[in-house]
Amino acid sequence: MDSIKGTDEKYLTVSELNWYVKQKFDRDPYLRQIFLQGELSNFRFRRGGHQYFSLKDDKSKINVVMFRGDFDKVKFEPEEGMKVYVTGRLSTYEAQGSYQFYAKSMEPSGLGALYERFRQLQEKLAKEGLFAQEHKRPLPLFPDKIAVVTSASGAVIHDIMVTANRRFPHAEIDLFPAQVQGESAAGSLVSAMQQIQARADEYDVLIIGRGGGSLEDLWPFNEEEVVRQVYAMKMPVISSVGHETDTTLCDLAADCRAATPTAAAEMATPALPLVLAEIGQLQTRLLTDIRAVIQVRAQALAQLENSFIMKEPQRLYEQKMQQVDQLSQQLSRMMEVIVKDQGQKLSLLTQRLQHQAPDRRIKQLKQENSYLAKSLEMGIKRILEQKQAACRQAVQQLDDYSPLKTLARGYSYTTDASGNVVKSVQQLVPGDQVRLHLKDGQAIGRIEEIKEEKND
């Protein structure tokens, strides 16, 4: 037994070995944060759960687990065969003794990945209607205040202010500075727009933009949170991001898109000289129209003053007075007809009421009631007499069949010692005591002899 025990102690269980290896993996500092690139394989999206897939290159493959909380932070839709960058740690799945990569974050690989993210987000937001033409709002003709979201330094804000002041100096320009490049730019842009949204009643239009740059430089204007905030603004939005050849999702969500900051300022403001010239033309046309109207009205007034009506104004109401007299006569005749008709109806109703007078009806009902009461009384008396005769007859029949009546005629009946009526000699034996019941009393006797008689 001792030798067997010593042999067992040299061997590890499978669980012990897997646990030991897991500890080695988890304590290795080089395996706690690994930056990995590869191609997605066996990727099947599991809605609302953890994701299990593989990363591979042309020679090897490794299993990957990405828990739900980490996968929810992924900003694109992974697809089978897509090349990605993944960060995470390497450990073992102790229950199966296999090692796997636990992913914490995932990004598409390379510049092509940015275009893929752009395409996926554009398709998603388009389905929601964020770029629909029917949601586009017209720009105000004469804005009082214009909000601008861009970098505090640079040519963008300078070009906007110079152009706006030249075209329409009445408009007030307020800058809400924001970062327009880098990892924190999206949050900065959203924060600036939210400040404007909180004072939406003060501003007539919003300009958001920046100068040119690479796709990576312009990427904050493609972030979903920025695009959604542009769409949600309560005032019209002009987007001017990059050069004319650049198109961002922010441009698509805005109400208008301008190729340059200068073009954005021109769209937001009217050209004052042109406006003044147009106002002058409108003023001239208005004065001409007013003079023409006054002239026409003056001619009409002169004709009216010279008309015979103005010289003999009583003619205006002579015919009306005649019409009033005619209507009065018609009204009087109509009233007479109505009164006569209603009088006839009243007379007819009076006759009908007299014919159906309540006192006559009441008298008739009283007579009917008296007759019915007498009939009921006679019927009850007749039925009572019939019932009394039937009762007397039943009493007589009952008396005729009474045992006492039978005893009175000289008959008797016999009972045994227990009080049972004796109906047959089969109930008795010699020596039994019996009781004879007569009409005026009872007698007690004893059986001396029994003789049977057979009746045919």
From Swiss-Prot:
Record keyword Nuclease present: yes
Main location: cytoplasm
Signal sequence region: none
GO biological process: DNA catabolic process
Keyword terms, alphabetized: Cytoplasm, Exonuclease, Hydrolase, Nuclease
Reactions catalysed: Exonucleolytic cleavage in either 5'- to 3'- or 3'- to 5'-direction to yield nucleoside 5'-phosphates
Keyword Magnesium assigned: no
NCBIfam families noted in UniProt: xseA (TIGR00237)
Similarity section: Belongs to the XseA family.
Subunit (UniProt): Heterooligomer composed of large and small subunits.
Function: Bidirectionally degrades single-stranded DNA into large acid-insoluble oligonucleotides, which are then degraded further into small acid-soluble oligonucleotides.
Record protein name field: Exodeoxyribonuclease 7 large subunit
Native source organism of the sequence: Lactobacillus delbrueckii subsp. bulgaricus (strain ATCC BAA-365 / Lb-18)
